[in-house]
Amino acid sequence: MSAPEHAAGLDGVAATRPRVEALTRPHRLRPGARVAVVAPSGPVPEERLRAGLDILRGWDLDPVVAPHVLDTHPTLGHLAGADRARARDLTEAWCDPAVSAVICARGGFGAQRMVDIVDWRAIREAGPKVFVGYSDITALHEAFALRAGYATLHGPMVAAGTFLSDPRTQESLRATLFEPESVRTLGLEMARALAPGRARGVTLGGCVSLFTADLGTPYGRPSARGGLLLLEDVGEEPYRLDRVLTQLLRSGRLDGVAGIGLGSWAECGPYEEVRAVLLDRLGGLGVPVVEEMGFGHSETALTMPLGVSGVLDAERGTLTLDVPALR
């Protein structure tokens, strides 16, 4: 007997909230494509950036580094330069007709500070392009979804340690960029059900603390109704994960969610304690929940498309996309 397929949004409250809809997918990359590297968040180590650029060149891509990528804010050392400079780099890279993709150099903190300075009208007028990042970049994934209607890639960043050291992480991104039909079924071998079931929906999410921080902002997502919510985090102790998940529950953001896929919880304490929080806060929603899918701050970080419809199967530990991540 197959697992039950959950239909989100059937209760009265959740049904009044807007559904998560599939977004416009950008085109896949071709050999020789120009890729802009930007730093919306924290300062970028130059040696690691160079190593990441070499990997991209090895894929026959043409990476160009935005003007302020190696900046450091004069008084706030956790930022890669001034907010307006970082926002301008992203806007100009996106609006450059020669650029096919924009990949972030690293996370940290800072995307929330610049997201409202980005020229979203110009972004919309320029049309969809490939956008890649994770962690702090969750704020921009949400903005591209809600302000531009573009699907994006929750994937490794150019100067991130996992991208530099793990061949499987590299291959997941490379295949998604060039051969997206080959990676329509996602999930590492260790993935398993935290709560049973099978659900169809549209992917969204990212770093749970950043996803939660968007609550109450002018462009914050009203709900995850009909969505397959992908969550992970780093450096958040179990009680802090409890807090952000409880906030998501109390705010109604999880009303009508179709299913939940969980990635890594690096430096969040013993996994048994983290798992207990995840089960307590998410296990009672009546939707499938898959743990250890292999995305985020993990030794192997799969590229996960956001804004694409698919099926989450808890028993198989997989997310299967209805269409390739890129056209």
Show which residues each predicted segment covers.
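Buried hydrophobic positions in well-ordered alpha/beta secondary-structure cores of metabolic enzymes
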Residues: 37, 102, 136, 211, ...
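ATP/nucleoside-binding phosphotransfer catalytic cores, i.e., glycine-rich phosphate-binding loops
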Residues: 262-327
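Conserved anion/nucleotide-ligand pocket segment
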Residues: 149-212, 216
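Conserved beta-alpha junction segments in alpha/beta enzyme cores
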Residues: 43-55, 198, 202-234
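Internal helical hairpin/lid segments
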Residues: 219-274
